[in-house]
């Protein structure tokens, strides 16, 4: 076998292999690209500074540093470089914002400057590039579609329920699913003695959003519903893995399994939604609006004139809006509920306080309602602390500057990608006393009788400003209704002697490791039982 420099030269000059000339051309191209990468960065105008940050490697930037737990790495770096810092991912400069006040300054007070989305290649496959959440568009048409989506979602959540036991449709849907879960969990206890509730939570939460968006509740073993749940899980897994080609342009011209998988799962989900929308079109009756999809179709068919023509939704945008609403109302709620149940099991004394509050305020005869939220401050504080402590959404979807701007004295050029480190803000020792500890009381007044709105508003989970999650209100309501209904009926614990690892696993939403040791038992006999 040939070895050493001489052998290498022989191979380089062999027919069919890379020649010395090609090596020189490749090296020159690399140097040119490196030079372009360095010169493409705009220098700050006189009197301003560019954000500080760690040096990166040529072509790779800081990718290697950020491979594992980027929320923790960026939090550590923020201690050195401050709340406005710059890292490089591939050849792309990225500004990372930390600190609650800095994030509020950017997303709320300078909202127009930071409301853009970066034009990442992979995002064109989300709703065929028409996604409200991922699209780089942020003009009047986008704002009108976003408002339409919010109104439709809210309308079919708080609309009056036909049943006397619920005050609105959301309560009715959640009550149906939560009752199913209570029965299912008790059945699983008889069969297995311990289990993992998360897959059942997923299906129930998916059923709620299906009922609101599509007017349909599925059986829990329905293959269409399970397929949707699996697609959403696939989307989260692929998106969390990231696509290097979004930040390293050269990789776009090479075979890319990650991009292919992302494209495939989005195409399958769009086809699922498109089929349902087409079915709604064929059965649409403007005198009988059944769900969010009907509401959007009705709005689409209204004749618009003048300025309104530009913002009228198309048939294609209806599919993308429903796509977004489903995504906004599914994975975040499921993950938040799974964390709430884990914390309730880990801290039984806290669980008992919640149940005592439920017994005293609601009793055991009727189910919790949204109108009870204001009378259950400790329960609300528990949910907020679960949001803060888990920081299940460590980052928002990346933002982008819409024009040259200045933040905290640092110059940030137009079209700069911006990461919002929500995890850092939720664990900032400057804001929170003893942030690693789980303490719902931090959100209550001194007497423990009222929720502190000031403290509650410090928790970042759904983003801020003009790109704030459109499903935030519905998501918070769902978590409250599911959790209170389950804890009213069941006592949650972990199997004795089992070690549980709740270290968040980094992803689009952060989850703890699979845990098969949940145990549940009924808190009191059913009405009419012995």
From Swiss-Prot:
One GO MF term attached to the UniProt entry: iron ion binding
Location(s), subcellular: Endoplasmic reticulum membrane; Microsome membrane
Reaction it catalyzes: an organic molecule + reduced [NADPH--hemoprotein reductase] + O2 = an alcohol + oxidized [NADPH--hemoprotein reductase] + H2O + H(+)
Keyword Iron included in the entry's annotation: yes
Induction / repression: By 2,3,7,8-tetrachlorodibenzo-p-dioxin (TCDD).
Pfam (any one): p450
Binding residues annotated for heme, in chain numbering: 469
Topology class, membrane: Peripheral membrane protein
Cofactor: heme
InterPro entries, alphabetized: Cyt_P450, Cyt_P450_CS, Cyt_P450_E_grp-I, Cyt_P450_E_grp-I_CYP1, Cyt_P450_sf
Statement: the UniProt record of this protein carries the keyword Iron: yes
Top-level taxon of the source organism: Eukaryota
GO BP annotation list: response to antibiotic; xenobiotic metabolic process
Function: Cytochromes P450 are a group of heme-thiolate monooxygenases. In liver microsomes, this enzyme is involved in an NADPH-dependent electron transport pathway. It oxidizes a variety of structurally unrelated compounds, including steroids, fatty acids, and xenobiotics.
PANTHER family linked: CYTOCHROME P450 1A, STEROID 17-ALPHA-HYDROXYLASE/17,20 LYASE
Family of the protein in this entry: Belongs to the cytochrome P450 family.
Protein name (record): Cytochrome P450 1A4
Source organism phylogeny: Eukaryota, Metazoa, Chordata, Craniata, Vertebrata
């Amino acid at each position: 076998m040939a070895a050493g420099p001489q052998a290498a030269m022989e191979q380089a000059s062999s027919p069919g292999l890379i020649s010395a000339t090609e090596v020189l051309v490749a090296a020159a191209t690399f140097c040119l690209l490196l030079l372009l990468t360095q010169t493409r960065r705009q220098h700050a105008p006189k009197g301003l500074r560019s954000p500080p940050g760690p040096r990166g490697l040529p072509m790779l930037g800081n990718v290697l540093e950020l491979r594992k737990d980027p929320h923790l790495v960026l939090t550590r770096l923020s201690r050195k470089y401050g709340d406005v810092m710059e890292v490089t991912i591939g050849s792309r400069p990225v500004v990372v914002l930390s600190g609650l006040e800095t994030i509020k300054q950017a997303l709320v007070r300078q909202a127009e400057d930071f409301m853009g989305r970066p034009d990442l290649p992979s995002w064109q496959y989300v709703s065929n590039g028409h996604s409200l959440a991922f699209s780089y568009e942020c003009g009047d048409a986008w704002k009108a579609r976003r408002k339409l989506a919010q109104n439709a979602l809210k309308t079919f959540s708080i609309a009056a329920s036909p049943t006397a036991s619920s005050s609105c449709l959301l309560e009715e849907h959640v009550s149906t699913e939560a009752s199913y879960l209570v029965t299912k969990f008790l059945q699983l206890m008889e069969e297995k003695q311990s289990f993992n509730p998360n897959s059942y939570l997923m299906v129930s939460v998916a059923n709620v959003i299906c009922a609101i968006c599509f007017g349909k509740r599925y059986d829990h073993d329905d293959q269409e519903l399970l397929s949707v749940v699996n697609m959403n899980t696939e989307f989260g897994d692929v998106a969390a893995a990231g696509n290097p080609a979004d930040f390293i342009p050269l990789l776009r011209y090479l075979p890319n399994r990650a991009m292919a998988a992302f494209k495939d799962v989005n195409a399958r989900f769009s086809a699922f939604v498109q089929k349902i929308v087409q079915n709604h079109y064929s059965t649409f009756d403007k005198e009988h609006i059944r769900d969010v999809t009907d509401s959007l179709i009705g709005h689409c068919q209204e004749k618009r004139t003048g300025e309104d023509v530009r913002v009228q939704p198309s048939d294609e945008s209806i599919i993308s809006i429903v796509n977004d609403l489903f995504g906004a109302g599914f994975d975040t709620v499921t993950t938040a509920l799974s964390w709430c149940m884990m914390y309730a099991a880990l801290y039984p004394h806290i669980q008992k306080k919640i149940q005592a509050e439920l017994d005293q305020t609601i009793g055991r005869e009727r189910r919790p309602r949204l109108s009870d939220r204001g009378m259950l401050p400790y329960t609300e504080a528990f949910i907020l602390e679960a949001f803060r402590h888990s920081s299940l959404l460590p980052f928002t979807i990346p933002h982008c500057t819409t024009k040259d701007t200045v933040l905290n004295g640092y110059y940030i050029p137009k079209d700069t990608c911006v990461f919002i480190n929500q995890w850092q803000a939720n664990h900032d020792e400057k804001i929170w006393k003893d942030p690693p500890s789980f303490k719902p009381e931090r959100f209550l007044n001194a007497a423990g009788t009222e929720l502190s709105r000031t403290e509650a508003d410090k928790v970042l989970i759904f983003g801020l400003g003009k790109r704030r999650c459109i499903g935030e209100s519905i998501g918070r309501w769902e978590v409250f209704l599911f959790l209170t209904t389950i804890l009213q009926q069941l006592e949650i614990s972990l199997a004795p002697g089992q070690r549980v690892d709740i270290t968040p696993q980094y992803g689009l939403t952060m989850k703890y490791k699979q845990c098969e040791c949940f145990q549940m038992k009924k808190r009191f006999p059913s009405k009419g039982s012995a």
